[in-house]
Regions:
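N-terminal secretory signal peptides that target proteins for export/translocation
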Residues: 1-23
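Sec-dependent N-terminal signal peptides
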Residues: 16-34, 336
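N-terminal signal peptide c-region/cleavage motif recognized by signal peptidases
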Residues: 42-44
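N-terminal small/polar-rich segments of proteins
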Residues: 46-104, 156-275, 310-344
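Short proline/glycine- and polar residue-rich coil/turn motifs
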Residues: 67-68, 138-147, 230, 305-312
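A surface-exposed loop-and-adjacent beta-strand signature within N-terminal beta-sandwich domains
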Residues: 102-145, 288-290
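Predominantly extracellular/luminal cell-surface or secreted proteins
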Residues: 111-115, 124, 175-177, 254, ...
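Outer membrane beta-barrel transmembrane domains
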Residues: 281-285, 295-302
Length: 344
């Protein structure tokens, strides 16, 4: 029958119960207990169990932009081999780890699961403080054995979404003990007496890729301009660009379709052959022109607006104005289209 385990056994409490039982037992039982060390002393030394496959592993899962919201799993398969007669064939498993994978000051939630196919055992969300699960197997099972186990490092669905780009790492230790019996839950006790224990040191890496999404672009509207002749004052408007980036980025705004000269001078809205000058700025005072100076192929060009990114949506205000002193052209609707580029 398949076994799904959720709670580790408590070795200290079990040992107290065992010793109490021995104390209340018959003289023969007490004699057996006292004879055990002599038996072990007289028996040729047993070789300790070994992690004969994958005692040290470093494995990586790399997200893509498409699957960043999905669950991520890294399997760490290993085989514990014990050659001693008294080692036992039943198995216990445990781990020590932290519940997060870390990238500098950033982290993602992580857990460990385990599977022991030979005993139809699956364990979800293992105890992270070394609690032992098991023993799994028969009531009495002496002799050498090899047991295949898979520990899986899991980042739950959605845990990596909105996280900064980089490699998130978790290093953990697993250990497995063998016992000859499942009676009284002797998890780890038999292994401690016979050396039937083995360990593994593993590292899980989860790589979050650089990504940027342009969520919203502005439609800047100066509305109705009613002045006749040169405008007495600057006419202002504004819009918002919203991006979601998990890495440093720069937002550039192109020249538009009618700029006075490439990379310089006023941009211009048009109605047929008529033109209405305007400009786009980074600041509310309208002193820093926002364009593509420095080149859209690099991060940090002087014409753009740069930010380190947070992984969450960020909004940047685009300030627009028609300069004071502008002579208004013939009535009509004037438009221009500019290209917004996010470089990351």
């Amino acid at each position: 029958m398949p076994v799904t385990d959720t709670q580790p056994s408590s070795l200290p409490r079990r040992l107290i119960a065992i010793l109490s039982a021995f104390g209340l037992g018959t003289q023969a039982l007490s004699g057996s207990l006292l004879a055990l060390p002599l038996l072990l002393t007289a028996t040729p030394a047993q070789a300790a169990c070994t992690n004969s496959s994958g005692a040290s592993q470093n494995r990586t899962y790399t997200y893509t932009v498409a699957n960043l919201g999905n669950e991520a799993r890294i399997d760490f398969p290993f085989v514990i081999t014990c050659n001693g007669l008294l080692d036992g064939q039943n198995v216990c498993v445990g781990a020590t780890y932290t519940r997060s994978a870390v990238n500098g000051s950033n982290s993602v939630t992580m857990r460990l699961d385990a599977a022991i196919p030979a005993h139809s055992v699956t364990i979800t969300d293992m105890d992270n403080a070394g609690g032992m699960y098991g023993p799994y197997g028969a009531l009495l099972a002496l002799g050498p054995s090899s047991t295949s186990t898979t520990i899986t490092s899991v980042v739950p669905a959605g845990a990596a979404s909105g996280k900064m780009a980089g490699t998130y790492t978790n290093s953990f230790t697993i250990y497995q003990a063998k016992t000859a019996t499942t009676l009284l839950g002797l998890c780890g006790l038999f292994g401690a007496l016979t050396g039937a224990q083995a360990f593994g040191n593993y590292t899980a890496n989860f790589v979050v890729p650089k990504m940027c999404t342009l969520n919203a672009t502005p439609a800047i509207n100066f509305n109705n301009v009613t002045s006749i002749g040169p405008t007495a004052a600057r006419i202002d408007a504004q819009g918002t660009v919203t991006v979601e980036c998990n890495t440093p980025y720069t937002i550039y705004i192109g020249d538009g379709q009618n700029r006075v000269a490439p990379g310089s001078g006023n941009r211009q809205m048009a109605q047929g052959a008529a033109r209405l000058p305007y400009q786009l700025f980074k600041d509310a005072a309208r002193t820093q022109v926002w364009d593509a100076t420095g080149g859209t192929a690099v991060i940090g060009g002087s014409g753009g607006v740069s930010d380190p990114g947070t992984g969450a949506p960020q909004s940047k205000t685009v300030y627009a104005s028609i300069p004071a002193g502008t002579t208004l052209p013939v009535p009509g609707t004037y438009t221009d289209t500019v290209v917004i580029t996010v470089t990351y």
